[in-house]
Regions:
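Extreme N-terminus of proteins, especially the signal/transit-peptide cleavage junction
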Residues: 1-3, 75
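Basic/aromatic recognition patch in beta-strand/loop cores that engages polyanionic ligands
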Residues: 48-78
Length: 97
């Protein structure tokens, strides 16, 4: 398994995403969670694949989309840090302040 860790906020984000989707469909919630976790594994091996978004934050993070969710991570941290996992429909800039 590639080295990475989820910040406390990212862990809560992932739990909230699962709970939200599970209200309608448990299997879909499991699938989305698994797809997010697989994307994080991919990003550990290819940390600069994501996009910088200076319009959203001055933090040295990158963004990678999985469905309507944004994995926000520090590509330079070792191990790679998943900072947040947020819905693209939310005010991401405000949530990263």
């Amino acid at each position: 398994m590639a080295e990475h860790f989820y910040s406390p906020e990212a862990r809560l984000d992932l739990m909230g995403i699962w709970e939200f989707i599970a209200q309608a469909d448990l299997n879909a919630a499991d699938r989305v969670e698994q797809e997010i976790r697989l994307a994080v594994e991919w990003l550990v091996r290819n940390p600069h694949l994501g996009h910088s978004r200076s319009d959203l934050t001055s933090q040295p993070v990158r963004f990678w989309a999985v469905h309507s969710y944004l994995i926000i991570y520090d590509p330079n941290a070792r191990p790679l840090e998943v900072v947040r996992i947020l819905s693209g429909y939310r005010d991401v800039a405000a949530m990263l302040k």
